[in-house]
A protein has these predicted regions:
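Short Lys/Arg-rich basic patches
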Residues: 1-16, 23-27
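Short, basic amphipathic alpha-helical segments that act as recognition/interaction helices
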Residues: 31-55
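Generic solvent-exposed, charged/amphipathic alpha-helical segments
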Residues: 38, 124, 128, 163-171
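Charged, alpha-helical interface segments at or near domain boundaries
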Residues: 50-58, 65-77
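An N-terminal amphipathic alpha-helical segment
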Residues: 73-148
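Short, hydrophobic/π-rich interface segment
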Residues: 133-184
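C-terminal edge-of-domain segments
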Residues: 182-196
């Protein structure tokens, strides 16, 4: 009879430390380890079937949680471009200042929420996602940081706002801009960490 009950089950060995964490988490959630593990593995398979990975899903969850916590709003790039194009030069400069201040605020928010080692890795994913960019690279060596963003469909107006946002953010993270190369949809900015 016991053998019949076990026919549709397989045992998976995991390190003791992981099993202990699973037990603590399942107890906190008020469920059994078996049910918790079943749900987690089912969701992992679901993610794989969608062509993604667990790491990508967790990274995206972190990103969306941070965006939500910061009060960020998603808006269609084409619609936003139309709004910007209707502004006169003075209003565009005001908008650029607002975006730079927004970058400063977001930089302070990221400092408060993330550990230093995670910050630039997160920022790379964040910029790509929130600005709908095709490529983002962030190189860091000692006090030098180079941020490179590419978007094949971004207007010059949106490119300028992206630059303002990044400049404000990096200033809040205690980095001074040393060089920039800006074309429509292509941004390369170099920063140097400020010594306290």
């Amino acid at each position: 009879m016991v053998e019949e009950l076990l026919d549709d089950r397989k045992f998976i060995t995991v390190p003791k430390e992981l099993a202990d964490k699973l037990k603590l988490t399942s107890n906190r959630l008020g469920t059994s380890i078996t049910d918790f593990a079943f749900d987690a593995l089912t969701q992992a398979l679901r993610i794989e079937e969608m062509g993604s990975s667990i790491k990508e899903a967790v990274d995206l969850f972190q990103l969306v949680s941070m965006q939500r916590g910061a009060g960020n709003l998603s808006i269609n790039r084409g619609n936003f471009k139309e709004i910007i194009e209707q502004l006169n030069e003075e209003k565009r400069l005001e908008l650029s200042d607002i975006w730079e201040e927004s970058g400063r605020w977001y930089g302070a928010y990221l400092k408060a929420k993330l550990h230093d080692g995670d910050l630039f890795n997160f920022l790379k994913r964040d910029l790509k996602f929130s600005w709908n960019l095709d490529e983002v690279d962030i190189y860091q060596r000692d006090l030098l940081v180079i941020i490179r963003c590419v978007s094949f469909g971004m207007s010059m107006e949106l490119t300028d706002l992206l630059v303002s946002f990044i400049s404000g953010l990096m200033d809040e993270l205690n980095f001074s801009e040393t060089d920039r190369d800006i074309l429509r949809g292509l941004v390369i900015i170099k920063f140097l960490g400020k010594l306290n």
